[in-house]
């Protein structure tokens, strides 16, 4: 049995196909925080939207395979395989993530954990200039 928050998470990831940062940021609480393996956390709608805009502008063909999804209270855990295309090359990233929700059903915190060095290798192989990437 899935919770309503699990369905919200599935809808959020499905909406990455829109490549619309405004659609995606609408899932977040105004004071939300999003952190990933390779960069400082983005805080609030403005910073989160900026990162979303960069990511959807940089990649395409977003697909998210849920290996495991579960919830406890206001927290949803995901074990995923994230797939997307950069410079015509497929990227495949195993991810473990936690999404915390506020009382109104908006994402309050999103933390994704993955092997940054494995993704970085894929990005370099696709021709992405990674100079300065470790400064994030």
Predicted segments with their positions:
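A sequence-composition feature that detects small, non-aromatic residues
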Residues: 11-14, 29-32, 37-42, 96, ...
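Phosphate-binding glycine-rich loops and adjacent basic patches that engage nucleotide phosphates
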Residues: 8-18, 42, 58-63, 82-85
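Short, low-complexity N-terminal intrinsically disordered segments enriched in polar/charged residues
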Residues: 1-26, 30, 127-136
